[in-house]
From Swiss-Prot:
The system is composed of three essential subunits: KdpA, KdpB and KdpC. The keyword Nuclease does not apply. Belongs to the KdpA family. It is a multi-pass membrane protein. Part of the high-affinity ATP-driven potassium transport (or Kdp) system, which catalyzes the hydrolysis of ATP coupled with the electrogenic transport of potassium into the cytoplasm. This subunit binds the periplasmic potassium ions and delivers the ions to the membrane domain of KdpB through an intramembrane tunnel. Keywords: Cell inner membrane, Cell membrane, Ion transport, Membrane, Potassium, Potassium transport, Transmembrane, Transmembrane helix, Transport. This is Potassium-transporting ATPase potassium-binding subunit. Pfam families: KdpA. The chain crosses the membrane at residues 5-25, 64-84, 136-156, 179-199, 254-274, 285-305, 332-352, 359-376, 421-441, 486-506, 529-549.
Length: 567
């Protein structure tokens, strides 16, 4: 580890902390229907969209109606994207003549982008036409991110409102997030990326002659615009197969820092939106502190593991850390930081090959996802994910002091705890269930590239990434097979919607409750005691169940490596 590496990490953390309050304040005004700088331009567009949808901004929805609207919207998007891939060979904006996508891969890709996962069992520059990239994948990058934010806002309203039956309007929240938050920020990011050298074209691929006289085709496309929402919406699906390790997606250290900041910007700021909407910003900062402590701990361990390198190589008097699978223009510090950032949020973009990381270095991204990606998390998804743990934490606190659990004056009763645990337990059900099956059947084992614990880690990482809606992978797993396309697709759908529905049920229950005044026995939820309790609950309830699987994978691999055995 170097001072330069830690300075880069501290600069990133400082930028995020400085962004939380201004961006949080702006989003609070947007979802509160207040006037913003963009209102003169966007209000007419917003109202026109409401008229087309047959709704108004004043129309409110019960939680069941809100959830039904969300599910119908996502179903429509699923069908449209699937059909677009299946018939892309006959559609325009296909200058390179890409063929129709096979059914199992189209299902996997559709589930991936609709759920904000962006798991890719294909190479973007060799599989998808420009039309599919722009009208299919990029559109889902926007609306899947906006869907996550809408759920988070509905859940926040459940705490800020008292004795009501409605949580807002899904169509209004979706529209406002897209128009006022995602589009303006993406335009700024797109211009920044283009200025740094990222391509933005719908022309044919370029041709070049190498120094040896060979002909080389250089893939191009509308990269910058997709890159912007890929990062801001924590989608992660790359235009190119190499993702953000490709120089056309990530030319230099400046673009790399911008991309990492974009990944965390909205998720971190939602904690401030929460504090503002419930009338106590310290509540938001407490949640942000818990996220931040877990994040910094993960970065420190991952950076240490990668900087320490392989002990078997140390015996050859080679020092310099583990540079395998990393870009020299980024180095170990930025590669480790990016790996933790992309898995702490449900992004999945990569600048280094996670499969080439040291056993403990690769375990940290896996743990981030196993916790439900609530360390900042995806846009919206991270916030409503950590609120589920907040519900469990205050329930535990209530049991310890012998009082009915309360959070922000709302009583946390059996229904809320059951729904929270249902959502929390769906992750291990999917991850461990699919991993167990794939680890014993020939179809599952045929796709792994390495024997022993590392091969098991490849399978475990794949289902963890899919269920947690991340999308990154251990590249040694050949995932483009009918088995993995279908099962990982199902894991992605389970990880998205089996968490959303319990979260919406909790919101519907809480919004109808009165807020009790604070008393001397009320458990404080803005101090270090609550932050520590929340972190403990996250690690014990969310993480401990995965320890046996981790022991069979990365931990066993690390111990074997110490003894001189590699896989």
């Amino acid at each position: 580890m170097t001072i330069n590496g830690w300075i880069q990490i501290l600069v990133f953390c400082g930028i995020i902390i400085l962004l939380v309050k201004p961006l949080g304040g702006y989003m609070t005004r947007v979802f509160g229907g207040e006037r913003t700088l963009l209102s003169p331009v966007l209000v007419p567009v917003e109202r026109g969209l409401y008229r087309l949808a047959g709704t108004t901004e004043r129309e409110e929805q019960h939680w069941t109606t809100y959830a039904a609207s969300l599910l119908l919207f996502n179903l429509a998007g699923f069908l449209l994207l699937y059909m677009l891939q299946r018939f892309q060979g006959s559609l325009p904006f296909n200058p390179m003549g890409m063929s129709d996508v096979p059914a199992d891969l189209a299902f996997n890709t559709t589930a991936s982008f609709v759920t904000n996962t962006n798991w890719q069992n294909y190479g973007g520059e060799s599989t998808m036409s420009y039309l599919t990239q722009m009208a299919g994948l990029t559109v889902q990058n926007f609306v899947s991110a906006a869907t996550g934010v809408a759920i988070a806002i509905a859940l926040i309203r459940a705490f800020s409102r008292k004795s009501m039956k409605t949580l807002g309007n899904f169509w209004v929240d979706l529209t406002r997030c897209t128009l006022y938050v995602l589009l303006p920020l993406c335009i700024i990011l797109t211009l920044a990326f283009v200025s740094l050298g990222v391509p933005q074209t719908i022309g044919v691929y370029a041709e070049a002659t190498t120094l040896e006289g060979a002909r080389q085709v250089i893939a191009l496309g509308p990269v910058a615009s997709q890159l912007a929402i890929k990062m801001l919406g924590t989608n992660g699906g790359g235009f190119f197969n190499a993702n953000s390790a490709h120089p056309f997606e990530n030319p230099d250290a400046i673009s790399n820092m911008i991309q990492m900041v974009a990944i965390f910007a909205i998720g971190a700021s939602l904690t401030n939106v929460f504090g503002r909407m419930v009338g106590n910003e310290r509540q938001g900062w407490a949640i942000f502190a818990a996220m931040g402590i877990l994040f910094v701990a993960g970065v420190a361990i991952c950076y240490w593991a990668e900087a320490a390198g392989n002990p078997l190589i140390h015996a050859l008097s080679v020092d310099g850390g583990n540079m395998e699978g990393k870009e020299t223009r980024f180095g170990i510090a930025m590669s480790a930081l990016f790996a933790v950032v992309t898995t702490a949020a449900s992004c999945g973009a990569v600048i280094a090959m996670h499969d080439s990381m040291m056993a403990l270095g690769g375990m940290i991204p896996m743990i981030n996802m196993m916790l439900g990606e609530i360390i900042i998390g995806g846009v919206g998804a991270g916030f409503y994910g950590i609120v589920l743990f907040v519900v469990v934490a205050v329930f535990v606190a209530g049991l310890m002091v012998g009082r009915t659990p309360e959070y922000l004056g709302k009583k946390i009763e059996a229904k809320e705890v059951k729904m929270a645990m249902l959502a929390v337990l769906c992750l291990p059900l999917s991850i461990l269930g699919f991993t167990a099956i794939a680890s014993v059947i020939p179809t599952g084992l045929a796709s792994i590239a390495n024997p022993g614990p590392h091969g098991f880690s490849e399978i475990l990482y794949a289902y963890t990434s899919g269920t947690a809606n991340n999308g990154s992978a251990f590249g040694g797993l050949s995932g483009n097979t009918p088995w993995y396309n279908i099962t990982i697709g199902l894991a992605m759908l389970m990880g998205r919607f089996l968490v959303i529905l319990p979260a919406m049920a909790i919101a519907g229950s809480l919004v109808a409750k009165k807020a009790a005044p604070q008393s001397a026995g009320t458990f404080p939820t803005t101090g270090p005691l609550f932050v520590g309790l929340l972190i403990g609950v996250i690690l014990v309830v969310g993480g401990l169940i995965f320890f046996p699987a981790l022991a069979l994978g990365p931990i066993a691999e690390h111990l074997a490596m110490i003894k001189g055995q590699m896989f």
